[in-house]
Amino acid sequence: MDLAHVKDNHVDLYRILHIHVNDNEHLNSVTPTLINKQFRKLSLTLHPDKSNESDLNITRDRWDNLQSAYRILSEHKKEYDIWYQRTFLHSNRELLEKLEISEKAKKEKLISYDEIEKIQRYGQTLRKLVHFEIPISDWRNPSFTENTDDLNKLTETCLFRIKLVKRKEYNNEQKLNEWFRKIDIPITVQYYSENNDQREDDLVVYASARNVQTTIEILRTIENEKELHPDILEFTPAVEFEHFSFKEKVELDPSLGSIIYNSSDNPIIM
């Protein structure tokens, strides 16, 4: 292997001698003494008589490359270094400069208008999730419906006192709620009467509907059907039925109606 072959095949002689050259400073610091030292050091393991490599061809190639690298750098180091700098270090410097420019551009890149719009839409979605009490984990597929499972704010208004035939399963709140749903009475147990232990044949439970409209519908059902289920001995509202009844229709004041609907042609009828 001669100098021409090295240049044509882009052979890094310093790598063969295990000398790391990353820039011009490293290249200029490589002395003939260091080259000689590395050659003697590697000869202890790469010489055919001392190598542990079982493949003789590999052993011979490694030894020939080491000898060639030492000889060329001993005789033509100045010429080789000029070529090495232009071939390896120049390309490395260009790559480093491109990398630095790219990294700097990423840091200085301003957020585009489209990205700002995405952030704004994401913020709007989060606000909707909070408003409708939807778990944040569902943000990709939100269903904007209000949570009706929470405790009704008008619990006392929508409360019923219910006397039931005394059965073991009715003492279990979860089972009793399931039973109410099964017989199409949309109410949720709030608490049991403290006197149930003293009752022999019946028990009293207090349950509420989820809103006033549902409460009115239940009251109308009671009025029409009289009996909801044989096990329900009494079903009475905590608030008298009359409080939900409006026998007279009163037209809302036009000025107030226009404020609410922003139109005097669409008044509220009570």
Swiss-Prot record:
Lineage per the UniProt record: Eukaryota, Fungi, Dikarya, Ascomycota, Saccharomycotina
Subunit structure: Associated with the spliceosome.
Described function: Involved in pre-mRNA splicing. May be involved in endoplasmic reticulum-associated protein degradation (ERAD) and required for growth at low and high temperatures.
Full protein name: Pre-mRNA-splicing factor CWC23
Keyword terms of this UniProt record: Chaperone, Cytoplasm, mRNA processing, mRNA splicing, Nucleus, Spliceosome
Location of the J domain: 12-84
Gene: CWC23
Residues making up the signal peptide according to the UniProt record: none
Any Pfam family matching the protein: DnaJ
One GO process term, biological-process aspect: RNA splicing
SMART domains hit by this protein: DnaJ
Protein location: Cytoplasm; Nucleus
Stated family: Belongs to the DnaJ family.
Coiled coil: none
InterPro entries in alphabetical order: DnaJ_domain, J_dom_sf
Keyword Flavoprotein assigned: no
Stored PROSITE patterns: DNAJ_2
SUPFAM superfamilies noted in UniProt: Chaperone J-domain
A GO term from the CC aspect: spliceosomal complex
